[in-house]
Regions:
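Short linker/helix segments within small regulatory modules
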Residues: 45-58
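Short Cys/His-centered divalent metal-binding micro-motifs
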Residues: 58-87
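A boundary/linker detector
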Residues: 1-26, 31-38, 80-125
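Alpha-helical and His/Cys-centered functional microenvironments
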Residues: 46-47, 70, 74, 99
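Histidine-centered catalytic micro-motifs used for acid/base chemistry in nuclease
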Residues: 40-44
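Residues in flexible loops and secondary-structure boundaries
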Residues: 28, 49-52, 77
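Short, charged/polar surface micro-motifs in flexible loops or helix N-caps
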Residues: 35-36, 47, 64-68
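Short, exposed beta-strand "edge-strand" segments with a Pro/Gly-rich flavor and a Y/T-containing core
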Residues: 6-12, 55-61, 70
Length: 125
């Protein structure tokens, strides 16, 4: 059975993962070095909120940060509290705003007539 446009839009491709890692210079947005064993890709606008899997809605974070964020816990870096759940969410959004001209939450949500081309955002270097 063919996947729906919504299901396809939520998926994160290998190419997107690589672009996200390059954008972040293989570090979590907290500054922790990422390895193949501790890296997870997070939808800033959640999949459950129709967040798309394109690079302008994805950040790479450690598996520990990912678990803590989804559990609404403090984010620890090197065993110390670094961010509250809310601060980490703001950090992720600010990271994307810094890298994508015109970044807005609404552009990261799939809509009935959503088309990736309509929501292309220019990546700033």
């Amino acid at each position: 059975m063919a996947k729906s446009k919504l299901t396809k839009a939520k998926e994160i491709s290998k190419e997107t993962k690589e672009r996200v890692l390059e954008r972040q210079r293989y570090k979590s947005i907290s500054g922790v070095a990422l390895t193949p064993y501790n890296t997870e890709f997070h939808h800033v606008i959640f999949r459950s909120e129709s967040g798309v899997g394109y690079e302008f809605n994805i950040v790479a974070i450690t598996s520990e940060e990912h678990r803590a964020f989804h559990d609404h816990q403090n984010i620890l870096v090197n065993g110390r509290k670094r961010y509250t759940y809310i601060e980490f969410g703001i950090l992720m959004k600010n990271h994307l705003k810094l890298h994508y001209s015109g970044w807005e939450e609404s552009k990261c949500r799939f809509h009935k007539y959503w088309d990736e081309e309509d929501y292309k955002m220019t990546r700033m270097e």
